[in-house]
A protein has these predicted regions:
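Short, compositionally biased P/S/T/A/G/V-rich stretches that sit at domain boundaries
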Residues: 19-50, 160-184
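Bacterial N-terminal signal peptides
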Residues: 4-15
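Solvent-exposed serine/threonine-rich low-complexity stretches and specific carbohydrate-binding patches
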Residues: 83-108, 142-149
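Extended low-complexity, serine/threonine- and proline-enriched intrinsically disordered segments
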Residues: 69-87, 125-134
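Short beta-strand elements
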Residues: 92-94, 133-184
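Contiguous beta-strand segments within globular domains
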Residues: 44-61, 68-70
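Short glycine/proline/serine/threonine-rich loop/turn segments at secondary-structure transition edges
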Residues: 111-126
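Hydrophobic beta-strand positions in extracellular immunoglobulin-like domains
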Residues: 60-63, 77
Length: 184
């Protein structure tokens, strides 16, 4: 009987270690980028100020299920002492390790947060990203080492981040990013 219990305990621990997570964050890549430039006819064209930069936060994630109907990526961005929050809900998530989500902060918002000072990379203090499915956290990753849920006690500012479809980057690299779920 002791042998059966021992085998069961060993098998149970092996199977627990052998389980894979449905979703896993692999990388957080922040970048400061300029607005895309488009040429068109039929109206007056305006040149964007190429010195102004958007904050782009790209996340790479792995998905184990063949397809998932919905996955929410929640972002916590600490920029110049202000905690910005935003989320993007994706649909039709395929299995694989090259799935990407992205969120943006406009140049005007960054200028506002800098209180008139020049926007610098040093102002980006930290980023945490969570993957949620049906409200359950599936994974969490932080850009720089910090205590667990460092953002929880801080005042949060929502509404200052944009998903890709809400930016001038919407038509670019369509097949690089997961499909954004639209409200209907």
């Amino acid at each position: 009987m002791k042998g059966i219990v021992a085998i069961t305990l060993v098998w149970g621990s092996i199977s627990a270690f052998g389980q894979t997570r449905d979703f896993q964050l692999l990388r957080i890549a922040p970048n400061f980028i300029s607005s895309p430039q488009f040429t068109y006819t039929g109206a007056q064209q305006y040149v964007a100020d190429l010195r102004e930069r958007w904050l782009e936060v790209e996340v790479t994630l792995a998905a184990a299920p063949e397809f998932s109907d919905e996955l929410t990526v929640k972002y916590f961005i600490l920029f110049n002492g202000k905690l910005l929050t935003g989320e993007v809900t994706h649909t039709n998530i395929p299995a694989g390790r090259e799935n990407r989500s992205v969120i943006y902060v406009t140049p005007k918002t960054l200028q506002r947060l800098m209180l008139g000072r020049t926007v610098t990379k040093a102002a980006l203090q930290n980023i945490t990203v969570q993957l949620l499915q049906k409200g359950v956290i599936k994974d969490e990753m932080t850009l720089t080492r910090a205590p667990m849920q460092w953002y929880a006690a801080m005042p949060q500012t929502a509404g200052l981040t944009l998903n890709k479809n809400e930016t001038p980057f919407a038509p670019l690299y369509w097949d690089r990013y997961l499909q954004v779920k639209t409200a209907r």
